[in-house]
């Protein structure tokens, strides 16, 4: 649980400390602290069949090293997910399967449990055993405040909340940070969502099997389409208005490389659509050509998406264009191919992405204004919050490149970055504004607030960049960036030479950069102040006067 601590003056000369997530005043020092009583939760693990997910020795590769070596930044790969060769997991004494997918840097394992809904406060007890012995275990994000006990190669802890918990390890107990190459495991803890048929809805059931062509292009409204647990091969699922897609726990959907233009799951010009899932979409057999997407919705009003696991995306993973009243919650994305951007909201209004875990081969979580949806929306009032993102190549949370329309009032709030690695580019970084398509377009009123970063292996933590390298005949290259605030940014550790912020304005770019504020940024233990603005170890000026007049540090 992410915690925000607020200091409140309650009486003259009397100061009381409140914890924001509980709303309760701390007792006086002389009183006995209140002990929170919880009950052991009833859990349901997400389990996939052996037909869908195999042990690594049962794959064509035959061993883990060769399986991992089948990665290609553009090409296809078989067996996108395997049973984890690294972990054995018990929760409340119950076996919970752990699965492993490839990432850009090594592999990433995952497990998922649903907690039965209860009116009482609950807990789950975790016992994780690893194939190797590690001296240190840190659960990310650190704001979850999980204390881990270690005994040889067994790691134990107690969890109290729906959240995303990633177990990371280091060989040395005294290591300053853990190592993302050492068997990271993300545990999704979510509330159980039993199927409930909406009033006056009919049902259509899709049994496991091969579904080619346009077999699953649905047109009947007021219908719940139920994907049964088991192994499916699917060319594409297209949803109509007033529909529910319910993907049962344990459903494994392998996308087929056919019916270009039809997403594995998608829809357009529709309204009132809900997707509830506890299943996997595997895009490992889909080639990269830009015409076949894992998940794409355009011009949709009232859309909610929850509970998907998407692996090995062949191109941009979850795309929402010109959508209004949108929620994207508790999804797990693990990909490594080039252009496998994670979650994109483009030209969306009243959108929210929450409690997602994203690790991809390109940008992680982003806002854009592409115009690709061909709708009338001007992006406004959207937020990403309580997400966890690791980046292996480009940005974690960004406003990236395609500025074809105006965009305003967008927020990244209460998010975390586990590990941020990028290609050797001086501007790619975890918190990134990088624009250059249209100098007449304004992106403004942008807020990054309460962002924690565990380890940054990039040239900079924050980039604000306007360039002119690709005008595309759309008003000339560049952008207008105005009123951006970075507030309460906390960087735990970074590589040598990493700076806090770099601002760049291209020599031939059009537009402007104005009103950039950095407030209360903790950079590897140092809180940055106005005096640090002139220190190039923290702030790099490649924007001339726009840096001098447009950036405020406080």
Across the structure, where does each feature detected by a protein language model lie?
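Structural detector of coil-to-beta-strand junctions
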Residues: 236, 261-264, 294, 317, ...
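Right-handed parallel beta-helix
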Residues: 242-244, 249-250, 271-282, 301-312, ...
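C-terminal motif of bacterial Sec signal peptides marking the signal peptidase cleavage site
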Residues: 18-20
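Extracellular beta-strand-rich solenoid/capping regions of secreted or surface-exposed proteins
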Residues: 159-161, 212-220, 232-244, 254-276, ...
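Extracellular "leader-to-stem" segments immediately downstream of a signal peptide or signal-anchor
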Residues: 6, 29-229, 234, 240, ...
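Bacterial signal peptide processing site
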Residues: 22-24
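Extracellular beta-rich repeat passengers
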Residues: 422-554
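Positively charged n-region of N-terminal signal peptides that target proteins for export
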Residues: 1-8
């Amino acid at each position: 649980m992410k915690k925000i601590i607020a200091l409140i003056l309650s009486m003259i000369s009397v100061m009381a400390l409140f914890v924001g997530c509980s709303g309760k005043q701390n007792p006086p020092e002389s009183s006995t602290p209140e002990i929170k009583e919880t009950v052991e939760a009833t859990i349901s693990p997400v389990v996939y069949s052996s037909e869908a997910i195999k042990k690594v020795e049962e794959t064509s590769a035959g061993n883990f090293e060769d399986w991992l070596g089948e990665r290609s930044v553009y090409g296809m790969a078989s067996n996108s997910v395997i049973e984890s060769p690294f972990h054995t997991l018990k929760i409340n004494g119950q076996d919970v399967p752990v699965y492993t997918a490839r990432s850009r840097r090594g592999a990433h394992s995952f497990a998922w449990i649903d907690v039965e809904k209860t009116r009482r406060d609950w807990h789950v007890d975790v016992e994780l055993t690893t194939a190797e012995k590690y001296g240190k275990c840190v659960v990310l994000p650190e704001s979850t405040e999980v204390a881990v006990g270690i005994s040889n190669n067994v790691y134990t802890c107690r969890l109290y909340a729906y959240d995303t918990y990633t177990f990371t390890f280091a060989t040395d107990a005294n290591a300053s940070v853990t190592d993302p190459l050492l068997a990271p495991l993300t545990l999704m803890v979510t509330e159980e969502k039993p199927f409930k048929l909406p009033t006056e809805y009919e049902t259509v059931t899709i049994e496991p099997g091969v579904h080619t062509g346009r077999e699953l292009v649905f047109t009947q409204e007021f219908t719940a389409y139920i994907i049964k647990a088991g192994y499916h091969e699917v060319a594409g699922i297209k949803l109509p208005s007033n529909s529910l897609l319910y993907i049962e726990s344990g459903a494994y959907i392998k996308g087929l490389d056919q019916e270009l233009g039809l997403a594995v799951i998608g829809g357009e010009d529709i309204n009132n659509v809900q997707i509830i899932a506890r299943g996997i979409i595997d895009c490992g057999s889909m080639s990269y050509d830009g015409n076949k997407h894992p998940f794409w919705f355009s011009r949709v009003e009232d859309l909610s998406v929850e509970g998907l696991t998407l692996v090995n995306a062949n191109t941009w993973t979850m795309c929402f264009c010109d959508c209004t009243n949108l929620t994207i919650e508790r999804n797990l994305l693990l990909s490594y191919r080039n252009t496998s951007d994670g979650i994109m909201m483009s030209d969306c209004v009243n959108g929210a992405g929450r409690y997602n875990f994203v690790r991809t081969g390109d940008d992680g979580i982003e806002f854009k204004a592409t115009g690709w949806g061909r709708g009338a929306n001007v992006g406004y009032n959207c937020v990403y919050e309580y997400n966890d993102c690791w980046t292996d190549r480009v940005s974690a949370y960004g406003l990236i490149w395609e500025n074809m329309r105006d965009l305003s009032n967008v927020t990244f709030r209460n998010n975390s970055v586990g590990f941020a690695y990028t290609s050797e580019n001086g501007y790619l970084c975890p918190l990134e504004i990088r624009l250059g398509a249209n100098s007449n377009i304004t992106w403004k009123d942008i807020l990054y607030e309460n962002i924690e970063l565990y380890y940054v292996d990039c040239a900079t933590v924050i980039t604000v960049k306007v360039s002119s390298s690709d005008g595309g005949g759309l008003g000339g290259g560049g952008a207008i960036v105005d009123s951006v605030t970075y507030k309460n940014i906390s960087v735990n550790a970074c590589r040598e030479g990493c700076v806090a912020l770099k601002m760049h304005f291209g020599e031939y770019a059009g537009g402007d950069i104005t009103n950039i504020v950095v407030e209360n940024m903790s950079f590897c233990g140092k809180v940055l102040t106005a005096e640090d603005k002139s220190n190039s170890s923290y702030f790099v000026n490649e924007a001339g006067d726009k840096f001098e007049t447009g950036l405020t540090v406080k």
